[in-house]
């Protein structure tokens, strides 16, 4: 028997729609696929392994909820291409409630008193650790928040020389107590952070955790290149690494 999927939460700015909580396993499977890319009806049927009638019912329900929509295929107007029409804001997984060290009192005392960790940073880490323990995933919100922060601080760091801009960013990062940042510029910009403010004290989960950082870099470099960029965290303290590494890749000209 397969494990239950985490409940997913979507929001839509339309006042008549608001927030939708999705629990249906079939709907969750469909939405996971559509978060990766737009898909035709037959593709969705094939990938879910469900009957056409079952998929059709779920797609109709998701459309009526304002979570997805569709467009007519540009070549064959008999076909529909489905896409997500709302914002994915997080998920809740109640299947694992194991207590983790980072939320226990002795761990907090050790880092506040014995190690003299930055209190505001420890508060942030404790909150994130508690969310992880309770199975609450707000990574999309953190990334969106980071994106807004990156765009708001861009003008303070900007220089038309990329090397100077990166040095300004590294100085800002250290001055604000966010960690130590180094970089390597190529077709893909590689950013390495040490003593990461976002994740250094978080539990080892085997997955990257720096979605606020990812969003900040996304916002900064989208503004710098005036292009959409893809930012991927390839190494992280929560993956057992001794640093966090981000790869920034400009994608294409804005339409």
For the regions a language model picked out, list residue spans one by one.
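N-terminal accessory segment detector
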Residues: 2-14, 20, 42, 46, ...
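C-terminal non-catalytic interaction appendages of large macromolecular assemblies
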Residues: 209-255
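Catalytic-loop motifs flanking and including active-site residues across diverse enzymes
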Residues: 26, 123, 213-216
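Short capping segments at the starts of secondary-structure elements
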Residues: 25, 36-40
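Short helix-coil-helix linker/hinge
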Residues: 20-27
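Pre-recognition alpha-helix immediately N-terminal to the DNA-recognition helix
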Residues: 28-32
